[in-house]
Amino acid sequence: MTIHIFLCFLLILKIVNALKSNRFSSYIYTPKTFLYNNKSIPNKKLVRKFVNRIKLVDDTIKSNEHIIKITDNATNKIKELQKECNDDYLILKLYVENGGCKGLKYKLNPIKKNEIEEDDYIQQFDELKFILSIDSTSVIYIYNNTLDYSNDLISGGFKFINPNATKKCGCGKSFNV
């Protein structure tokens, strides 16, 4: 009986800690070394290092860098889509939603200029006449990704290469951070 009570207590403690976590932060697991006071210290265990992703994104915006990079294959496909588009710029809305095998999946949909929300992060590619409108709540999952395109018959289309993902689904459509 005491074991059951103890296990219930541990479960409640885990739930409370999960509810306290901040959705705007993540942890990086470093298996070999970590930095402490700018010194590299060897580590035999996994160490948690707090990373403020919103600050990274805000610094990126201030330095005029792109939140997401685009490969040559994706650039060529965007040029094709731009030719089919009736507007001056091709505008795609990028966001992350719950779903897929690993918990999160990307959504990329064409939108009109008046559908861009005020709090979206805008990434403009003038040479391609292309605007990427990134949902403000999704930007923490999209930061530092690479957009690629594949003509494969199976699982072809736009794909995201996410260096921040800790788990990926076999088909490559969903991920977890």
UniProtKB/Swiss-Prot annotation:
Alphabetical UniProt keywords: 4Fe-4S, Apicoplast, Iron, Iron-sulfur, Metal-binding, Plastid, Signal
Gene3D superfamilies the UniProt entry points to: HesB-like domain (2.60.300.12)
A GO term, aspect molecular function: metal ion binding
Intracellular or extracellular location(s): Plastid, Apicoplast
Residues spanning the signal sequence: 1-18
Database matches in SUPFAM superfamilies: HesB-like domain (SSF89360)
BP GO terms, sorted: iron-sulfur cluster assembly
PANTHER family: IRON-SULFUR ASSEMBLY PROTEIN ISCA, CHLOROPLASTIC
Family that this chain belongs to: Belongs to the HesB/IscA family.
NCBIfam families, alphabetized: iron-sulfur cluster assembly accessory protein
Functional description taken from the UniProt entry: Participates in the sulfur mobilization (SUF) pathway for iron-sulfur (Fe-S) cluster biogenesis. Involved in the pre-assembly of [4Fe-4S] clusters and their transfer to target proteins.
UniProt-recorded name of the protein: Iron-sulfur cluster assembly protein SufA
Organism: Plasmodium falciparum (isolate 3D7)
Gene: SufA
